[in-house]
Amino acid sequence: MALKHKDLLSIHDLEIGEVALILDVAAKLKRKQKNGEPHQYLKGKTLAMLFSKASTRTRTSFEVGFFQLGGHPIYLSDDASQIGRGEPVKDTARVLSRFVDGIMIRTFSHDSVVELAKYASIPVINGLTDLLHPCQALTDLFTIQEKMKVLKGRKMVYVGDGNNMAHSLMYAAAKVGMNMVCACPKGYQPDPHVLAEAQEDASHTGCTITVEEDVMKAVKGADVLYTDTWASMGQEEEHDARKKIFAPYQINAELLAAARPEAIVMHCLPAYRGEEITDDVIEGPQSVVFDQAENRLHVQKAIMALLMRDEVL
């Protein structure tokens, strides 16, 4: 079984069964890698990795993962490619389609990724945009499933800025029947269009996706507490102002105590300790942050294999 669409731009585009398929294949690939079993399903394939944003986890996990699948990744930053000098996205898409077998892009504008996929004849994977971060959110589902076995009916609370991470988590939760609350200050809540789409998805899986300003009210009964940086790339000038606004939304021992006793803590990294999360919590026994980071490798391998391999895994 493969994915219905040739691209992975948003979790909203995935069918419920496709999310389960990605998680299942990720588990198989993780076992194979841990057991030293060969799994070079993309031998002879080439992946172009386009980066407009700095990266540690995205670049490393995609590059290493594609090597482990037997393929050859090529890294192209804006300053090392013509797209960074103003070449139309549609031209880049059509040229790369004649050279490589897939494209992963990490950039600012989501519209650019949509345009890239429109004109490319090969799979395009959204490695992150200002609107969405689907590979991370699928990784988060995989991590929660590893720790808690069952996803449906769980309660996840995202605390902080209603950013690209919050958006993709809402889509992800809705697809698997997880209840999700976004605890965000007024003026920093998720995009209303994304919220409406996630709530529509949730209506088919019997869960709820809501937004709440009162963070203590939001976290009651939470199985998962999740946060992200308060100022994303491109928002550095807002950092000081955001620190004051988001101060009540820090994940600390007091907030964690309001969740379920067995709740886990997640962060997509990089973490700014003492701001959105305290050092004692991220280093504490309920933190799964570094397991979560590792799982980017396994989930993205599953995504690449499902999009770029003709045969059934």
Regions found by a protein language model. Name each.
Residues 52-64, 148-227:
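Glycine-rich phosphate/diphosphate-binding loop of Rossmann-like nucleotide-binding domains
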Residues 69, 99, 119-120, 176, ...:
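Short, structured coil segments at secondary-structure junctions
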Residues 1-14:
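Generic N-terminal amphipathic, Lys/Arg-enriched alpha-helix
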Residues 199-279:
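Rossmann-like adenosine-cofactor binding region
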Residues 262-263, 268-313:
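Adenosine-phosphate binding glycine-rich loop
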Residues 34-36, 40-145, 273:
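Phosphate/diphosphate ligand-binding glycine-rich loop within oxidoreductases
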Residues 42-47, 152-154, 262:
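Phosphate-coordination loops involved in phosphoryl transfer and adenosine-cofactor binding
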